[in-house]
């Protein structure tokens, strides 16, 4: 299961790293319990809280036709003190 798409690095998410909270975009069809079990198994950490929200897709215009991108889900995962997740940085070329 590839539940986590990629890590999110915004001003807020970088600030939350100090509170042992990690932010990432996940598959929109995934549930909280699926993501929690996947994070605990894959990274070997203990999750104490998860917050999620769905972000709307952005409008895209292609000539006279107006379309939109898909909406997506963002999770803020809080870990127990003493645990950490290595950065999920994907190199872009």
From Swiss-Prot:
Keywords carried by this UniProt record: Chloroplast, Plastid, Ribonucleoprotein, Ribosomal protein, RNA-binding, rRNA-binding
Name the UniProt record assigns to this protein: Large ribosomal subunit protein uL23cz/uL23cy
Chain's role: Binds to 23S rRNA.
HAMAP family: Ribosomal_uL23_B
Keyword Nucleotide-binding belongs to the record: no
Family from the record: Belongs to the universal ribosomal protein uL23 family.
Family annotation (PROSITE patterns): RIBOSOMAL_L23 (PS00050)
Lineage: Eukaryota, Viridiplantae, Streptophyta, Embryophyta, Tracheophyta
SUPFAM superfamilies to which the protein is assigned, alphabetical: Ribosomal proteins S24e, L23 and L15e
One cellular-component annotation, GO: ribosome
Biological processes per GO annotation: translation
Pfam families: Ribosomal_L23
Quaternary context: Part of the 50S ribosomal subunit.
Localisation per UniProt entry: Plastid, Chloroplast
Matches recorded under Gene3D superfamilies: 3.30.70.330
UniProt superkingdom: Eukaryota
GO terms, molecular function: rRNA binding; structural constituent of ribosome
Primary site of residence: plastid
